[in-house]
Amino acid sequence: MTAYKDRSKEELLQEKSQLEAQYKEFQGKGLKLDMSRGKPSAAQLDLSMGMMDVLDSFTDLKCEAGIDCRNYGVMDGIPEAKRLLGELIEVPADNIIIYGNSSLNVMFDVVSHAFTHGIMGMTPWHKLDKVKFLCPVPGYDRHFAITEYFGVEMINVPMTPQGPDMDLVEKLVSEDEAIKGIWCVPKYSNPQGYTYSDETVRRFAALKPAAKDFRIFWDNAYNVHHLYDEPQDVILELLSECEKAGNPDM
């Protein structure tokens, strides 16, 4: 197939006419396609229909801590929910916060708070001359949209089948105090479906960033959403690895 740049004007006009005809044909079909990403199908939604039958007007709606769950609840979530999520992601319930209805919502709020109030008493990012983030590419565009929204300088880091290029990550974060974070989808990273290796996770946990308020944004969105029934990828739990490496808050 001849590249467009090598075609004559007549050939390009002919191609344009053919594509317009195809476009009109598609329009004529009256298709109404929902191309939303990550939106469950009706069959997937049906899996949770049993939840609709669990409660009725006679149900005791107080949790084990005595909190009336019909009300606003508590800031970090009820104990039962924290324990359930802790078991799913292999993290102690004390380290779980039940918050928001999506990880993207939570990450946006964390970045926003870092800009307005800083992280753990450190300088708010809006007072800094420059804020930078490492962005493994290809990666998730909605992550990048957050940093773009806040005017953060984004630095590309190439992806490998084992995860981001850790030689480059280690070099960049150790040399530049303006680098405040990195976006990560550690399991089945879009679009290649790569899962971070054990070595990659341990190297993340052992990072020595120049910025004391550097944070790893570990968006393990596909923790229980495997691509196939078999095999299923397993990754090391980052928080415990960070604690082992002496970086419990990173």
Sequence positions of predicted segments:
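Conserved core of the PLP fold type I
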Residues: 67-212, 223-246
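A generic secondary-structure signal marking the coil-to-beta-strand transition
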Residues: 29-33, 178, 249-250
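N-terminal "arm"/small-domain region of PLP-dependent enzymes with the aminotransferase-like
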Residues: 2-77, 86-87
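Glycine-centered flexible beta-alpha turn that most often forms the glycine-rich phosphate-binding loop
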Residues: 219
